[in-house]
Amino acid sequence: MKEFFDALETCAPAEREAALMAALARHVAHAQAASPAMAGILAGVDAGTIASRAALARLPVTRKSELLARQQAARAAGGDVFGGFAAIVRGKAMRRAYASPGPIYEPEGTAANYWRTARALHAAGFRAGELVHNAFSYHMTPGAFIVEAGALALGCTVFPAGTGQTEQQLQAIAELRPDGYLGTPSFLRILVEKAQEAGADVRSLRKALVSGEACPPSLRDWLGERGIQAYQTYATADCGLIAYETAAREGLVLDEGVIVEIVRPGTGDPVAEGEVGEVVVTVLNPDYPLVRFGTGDLSAVLPGACPTGRTNTRIRGWLGRADQTAKVRGMFVHPGQVAEVLKRFPEVARARLVVSGAMANDRMTWRVEAAPAPGLAERFAEAVRDVTKLRGEVELVAPGSLPNDGKVIEDARSYQ
């Protein structure tokens, strides 16, 4: 059995980086030429100079909220439903269009393995000639189609089970005897538990590719005890495959078709290796050429290489959401404001705003990592008032003492 999907998975890291950076400059030029929205976002950028991670980090981050706002504005004006982000139009070049919550509309091009999920399926043990039970939703959103495209590219046959109708799904599994499952881990557990209650035979399921929600080790072990090896994948409707789990069970390996950065929430500034931050993705997809797309998800880079021999960077997986906006005394405070305050104090390593107290009696405390210095707390408090229009206490703490969890705003209020 072939262990790796292709030679890219084991190429030298320097070789991969050189290829990605060469592709990056071409991708930026294509985005400017083919995507009106990206052309506006990247106005004045010389694509030929965007050939390094440092250069990429100087470009603006486009977050999901901005993508939605641009689509809504375009639709209100009777324009492009995709808000100018798509580089393809209806017809032969666009196989399907989808609606994700918002709604945000996404196009699907015609390339085989369009979402690049065949790589994740291969790492999870799926192979040509197998039957897969796809329990992701086939209704409006692209979830089911994202993994189906990868399964078909591998040479698998797909049963489009969709969601719900547990009894009918159990009957189909018992009679069709699929080799593997695609869907959320929680629904797989429901199927297995219902099968045990009903005496249905689901023993043909030996592997699973799960996504859409967290799959804690306890659930993975529970499934393993019942003969199902479950592997996580990190994919979105905007980006396709971002990262996937391997047999090593040590984080998720990045896909070969994306450039991933981990940035401080609310900014576009890359964090140090190992520090938790927002996942920002540049998707090398000519049909939907996103550059520095902010997913809103938190993760961190894992040091070292995957024990399986795959040489691409690994991340820790999904660690929560980066959108930490809090409403304090009737005013919104967001991560971008925290970043703006920090920029005024180069001597401050990190800071966290902790909002505590009961509802209608909010208390703001800024925990600031810095060496003691005369007047620093007072100057920091003044900057906070200037940026947020709110008063708060400032507490200086030792460098490195704040948790490495990606949070810059912590809502610790009681909502009882």
Task: Show the residue positions of the predicted features.
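Active-site glycine/GP-rich loop and adjacent strand/helix microenvironment
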Residues: 1-30, 154-416
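Hydrophobic alpha-helical segments that mediate membrane insertion or helix-helix packing
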Residues: 100-101, 132, 151, 260
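Nucleotide 5′-phosphate-binding alpha/beta core
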Residues: 1-99, 103-123, 127-128, 360-365, ...
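A glycine- and small-aliphatic-rich helix-loop capping segment at beta-alpha/alpha-beta transitions
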Residues: 115-116, 150-151, 250
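Conserved AMP-binding loop of ANL adenylate-forming enzymes
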Residues: 122-158
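Short, composition-biased local secondary-structure segments
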Residues: 110-124, 140, 186-197
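Short, glycine/charge-rich beta-strand/loop segments that flank catalytic centers
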Residues: 56-58, 131-140, 151, 165-169, ...
